[in-house]
Amino acid sequence: MKPIIIDVHSHLAPGVTTDLVISALNQGVVDAMVMFARNPSTDAEVLGLADALPGRVVVGLAFQQPDWMIQQPGVLKEIERKLETGRYHWLGEVILRHYGAPAIGAPPWDLGVDTDLFRGVLTLATRYDVPVTIHHELDDETREVFRNVLRDHTSAVVVWAHWCGRAAPDDAQEFLDEFPNLYCDLAASTLLTSFGSEKNPLFIDEDQWDPDWKDLIEAMPDRFLFGIDSVVAALFANYGKWLEDYQKMFALLSSDTRAQVMGGNAARLLPAEVVADLAQVAGTEVIGSVSSTTTEPIPALTIDCSLDEAGKRISCQAGGYQEGMKLTWTSTASSKTRGGDWYNFNVSEDLIGTEATVFLEECSRGVCRTAQVVVDLAGSG
């Protein structure tokens, strides 16, 4: 069976009817959509759509609504009230800094990232174990304040819309390296049509990725999510066309990367019962899932580290980890934290002749196991 495909960035908006969503799903290979209401559409309408299309719609709790956009102080209480129902499995799209998109009637916004309200959203996302998608443009003015807020909320799973706030690839990697719970969606609507300010595009033309972006996605395939950003009815009406364009570009990625980005990563961020419903209806296999009836023992989590000949760089490789689980590396000898199955860092001069402890944590939805190893630096230098 084919891997599950989840579009993590869709919007219920005026003119987006149940029949239009059905038509969009029938135009391509997408199995399910994460759906956020865009004013004047409401959360109640998204719940109704999910009830009408079981296993096809992941209910998002909407933020493109008046109470959030005017920063109403009581908005957090309403968000928590809805989360307590257990019906909402994603938050978004939280508008923070938005350059605006006149072609679709979207004005610019700059609500600020270091606010009690946004910090409250991250706290609720952590408390209720739901991912939160944010629209926040990365630029020199916002970089450090955003970093500092994330440092205060490292347990929140944040999906940074539009390829990490349309960051340059090296800037995106810097943030992804530091924050293991940070993901980026690749939603670009129509690939090459600009609805606002053009910045660091993913694609050079309709047949070619920006090479630096492609390299980063291949290097960190567990940190990117597929989405189209169907934000108006016209995009749903032409969903098959946009999906065909995306499929062509994603075919240029390795098969493992493609499977993770197109749905495997999103599935790991959702409750198991939700993923089971999606997979059952779509008749697909979820990447990284393990059958509950398996009798195969789970191998021990291991770390294999080596010191280069000059004694200045430690290189580590994970072993025994389960596919689809979240890996996080740390060390007493480095401030660098990263995800993935490998970990490299330089040895500072003041540590030569001592030792370094490397830690690896493997987690899925709050269940974790760890491994550690001590690297002797006595021979370094």
Language-model regions: role of each:
Residues 1-4, 9, 19-23, 27-32, ...:
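Mid-to-C-terminal alpha-helical segments outside catalytic/metal-binding sites
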Residues 40-131, 190-191:
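Active-site gating/metal-coordination segments in enzymes
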Residues 51, 55, 106-225, 277:
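Catalytic pocket-lining loop regions of alpha/beta-barrel enzymes
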Residues 311-320:
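A short beta-strand segment in extracellular, disulfide-stabilized domains
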Residues 319-323, 334:
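Short glycine/proline-centered coil/turn motifs in the loop regions
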Residues 330-346:
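Surface-exposed, flexible coil segments in extracellular/virion-facing regions
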Residues 341-358:
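Solvent-exposed segments in extracellular or luminal domains encompassing
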Residues 366-379:
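Edge beta-strands of extracellular beta-sandwich domains
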